[in-house]
Each structure stands twice: as C-alpha cells, then as structure tokens.
Amino acid sequence: MTAAATANVVTLPASEPAKAVRDTRPLRLITCGSVDDGKSTLIGRLLWDTKAVKEDQAATLQRDSTGKQNDLGLPDFALLLDGLQAEREQGITIDVAYRYFSTDKRSFIVADTPGHEQYTRNMATGASTADLAVLLVDARMGILEQTRRHATIASLLGIKQFVLAINKIDLTNYDRAGFEKISHDFREFALSLGVKQITAIPMSALKGENVVYSGQAAMPWYTGPTLVETLELATVRSAQAVGFRLSVQRVSRPGESFRGYQGTVAGGSVKPGDSVMILPSGMVANVSKIVTFDLVRNAAVAGDAITLVLDRQVDVSRGDMIVAIDSQPQSGLSFDAQIVALQPEGIEPGKRYWLKSGSRRQRVQVQPIAQLELKTGAWAPAQSLWMNAIGKVRLSFDEAAVFDPYDQNRSTGSFILIDPESNNTVAGGMITGKRADLGGIHKDGQRVLLSLPADLADQIMASELFSSRRDETEVRRVTAAQAAEIWANAASDI
C-alpha cells in the first residue's frame, strides 16, 4: 500500500456502483492460526478495503477505537469481528464469526475462528464448511504448535487449498529471508498432511499491504498475488461429484393420497423417473415427483430442500437415506474414522455413544486407535483421546450404518458423537472408509459372485430376503464391458 493510501485509510471509501459477479458461487474460507497472529484484524481489513463496511459501522469503529489506536493511528479493525463482550474485554476471538464481502469477480463468506487451544472445537466448526483456509503466522514467531493443529484440522476436514498469510511482516523490517524460511517450514509440514496447494503471502493486515492492495512499494522482492487475488482464483468444492443423496428429515402425509420424503439434497442430482434405493433397507423405487414449497420441479441438485415422491409404497423413516441406485454409499457395521475430541472428558475406549449423521442417530462403540503428534505429523498408538486431540478410531454399530467417505461427500461422511449420559457433543468426526477386515463379506464360508442384468439385480435387491441381509453383501455396478473384463481376469474356478 502506498504512503498516501495509508494516510487516508481512516476515511470510509466512497461507494461504487455494483459490478457483475462473474462466479456466482461464493467461496467459503476460514482464517485460522495461533493466538494474536492477527486473524480478526485481517478480516476487518478485508471488509474495509472491499467496501463491505457500512457508514454506521465505520462510525462505531472510529468511536470504539478511541484510546486503542496503534502507533500508526489506524483503527482497531478487529473490532469489526469481536462481537462477544468477553472477546472485547480479553482482546481475543472465542466464537466463530461469519462475515460477507465481495469483489467484482466473486463473493466470499469468511469465518474468523479462535486461536486459543481451548477453543479448537470452535475452529473445527468453522472449517467444516470451508473451501479454503487462510492460515496466519506471525512473521516474528514462525510456525507454532497451534498453527500445526489448525492446519491439521483443516486438512482432515477436507480443505486442500491453503493461503499461508505471513502477517506482521512490517515488524521484521520486511525480512525476505524470514518469510522464505517460514514458507519452507510450513511446506515441509504440509507434506505430511498431503497438502500441496499452498500460496505464501507476506503481508501487514494492519497496514493493508498485500491484502486487497499490493504491498510492493514496501516489499519489492515479492511479486506474487495479493490475498484477494488468490481468493478470486480459488475453486469451490462441488457436491455433484457423488451420486444423489437425500437424508430423510421428515415423512410428509398431509392426506391419504400423498406421501413424500422431505430433506435437503446432500449430493448429486435427481429427476422424475430416476431409480433410487432406500438405505439401510435396500428397497428400490422410482422417483415420480419432486415438490418444493410451492412448485413441482423437473430436477433437484445438491443444496435444494425438496419433498421426494416415489412411485410405490416403501418403508421409509426419518434418518433413512435415499440414494442413486447406480452410485451407492458404503453400508456396514464397522467403519474407520478420524475425530477431534471436544470435551475435557475426552473419548473413553470401548464406550458407547450416540452417533448423529444428518437426521440419523445410532448407538456406536468407539475404539481409539491412534493420535496425531502435531510436532512430528506422525500417528502414535493411543487407547484414549483427550480434549483437542486428533485421533483415528474404529466405529462399531449394532445396526447397519450408511456413509460416504468424507473426502467424497462432506454431508454424508461427517458425524458428531454424543455422550448418552450428559448429552454433550464430545467429538466431531469424518468417515475415512468401511473397515475391510470386518462385516459379512469376510465371514467364514463360501461366497458367490454374480454378474446380472441391472433390471434383474434391482428386483433381487428389492426382495425382503435380500433386504434382511443387506449388510452381508457388496454390490458394485459396472458396464457390460467392465463385467467382461472382470470375468476374463477372474480365476477359472470362480
């Protein structure tokens, strides 16, 4: 930012005519990092420089900043975010604050997450819906343990795009060597997380350098993008990659002639005539109608709240999942997962909890397997997990559970664990896959592999006998050419 721009920074920017947004999909991002790295100040600066601050907010900011000005005489931009009284008194972020801003290229939803270790669970909440993480690092302090913890949680929650915002670079006299060392250290750590898409930016959130406007006047050695330029080029995760998913929230029966299944589409798309399967029962039906509040739709996509009407009477209850018949989630009694422990009592080995995913709630036994060592990025064996620990666990269900892996569908691959005694939410988790060493398909005894026409297979799967033993089966739909290749490569005695 130029000296002239800095001098005039306390003046509310003049309003400009609204510009067309080229990408209509908002980018959801979080700011995270350790305590006092400048997360709230950065978002406040973003809001200010993108003209997302209203006149009354600007006046309040000027008033509340009285007596709190820094050495540059600039407002305390963090006050635009820290809304709780406790946050203002302590000068920290506790809750997750969501703010909205836009440029002429796209719109953004940003979550300011707390940096203190005891509020890690709040950070996990903010990360669960984000497409990109802005990880702040104090240029004077480098990578800290909480920095690693937040990066790990963001990665586990499916975030693959990171901006490493090396903040307060002005307090190091714009030290290029320090910036490059921090960038190198983080990239080395990120390799253990499988994160490769990292943009490192030196910046001063307070001065606004490399946030919205270029800081090249102060840092001629940096020729990369600003934060906003990076955000404008980021990609939004799509829920269309998997097949149709609808977690039934309510069965609607306003009259004898109507029966519909209500919920929000969690993946893919659906249209009248599509064949669907109800899980965990395995019953098959066709979609006859898609209804919203006041319309009959010819299609629905992820994010739409709909009422689905089927062409036959089937047993569907709240918590069941209606899915595309040719792209099914995993169903079984045992799954692997990764969790973040959220309560002081942690996760006790072998204890039974309530697991809630979507609108379905089931009893589950949780067995900790390993805990992530944040300093090394390695997994160490563990029998219990305490608050803020990141761990791998084995989930064992009494009845068949239905999930997608979290990296394929956030909605149908995530869950929370509830203590049945206290009703506290003790963990948030992500399904990594169905356990390969458990379940009916691996029981002793012979197995039979069949290759059937799709219509015949649908009839068999709709039978009561098949439905009663659905958790003992594995179904894979392939093309005729793929089936021929499988059988050609199979052993001769199959």
UniProtKB/Swiss-Prot annotation:
Residues 33-40 are annotated as: G1. GTP binds at residues 33-40, 112-116, 167-170. Residues 204-206 are annotated as: G5. This is Sulfate adenylyltransferase subunit 1. With CysD forms the ATP sulfurylase (ATPS) that catalyzes the adenylation of sulfate producing adenosine 5'-phosphosulfate (APS) and diphosphate, the first enzymatic step in sulfur assimilation pathway. APS synthesis involves the formation of a high-energy phosphoric-sulfuric acid anhydride bond driven by GTP hydrolysis by CysN coupled to ATP hydrolysis by CysD. GO terms for biological process: hydrogen sulfide biosynthetic process; sulfate assimilation. Belongs to the TRAFAC class translation factor GTPase superfamily. Classic translation factor GTPase family. CysN/NodQ subfamily. The gene is cysN. It comes from Rhizobium tropici. The keyword Nucleotidyltransferase applies. Heterodimer composed of CysD, the smaller subunit, and CysN. Pathway: Sulfur metabolism; hydrogen sulfide biosynthesis; sulfite from sulfate: step 1/3. Residues 167-170 are annotated as: G4. Keywords: ATP-binding, GTP-binding, Nucleotide-binding, Nucleotidyltransferase, Transferase. It catalyses: sulfate + ATP + H(+) = adenosine 5'-phosphosulfate + diphosphate. GO terms for molecular function: ATP binding; GTP binding; GTPase activity; sulfate adenylyltransferase (ATP) activity. HAMAP family: Sulf_adenylyltr_sub1 (MF_00062). It is an enzyme of class 2 (transferase). Residues 24-240 form the tr-type G domain. Its EC number is 2.7.7.4. Residues 112-115 are annotated as: G3. Residues 91-95 are annotated as: G2.
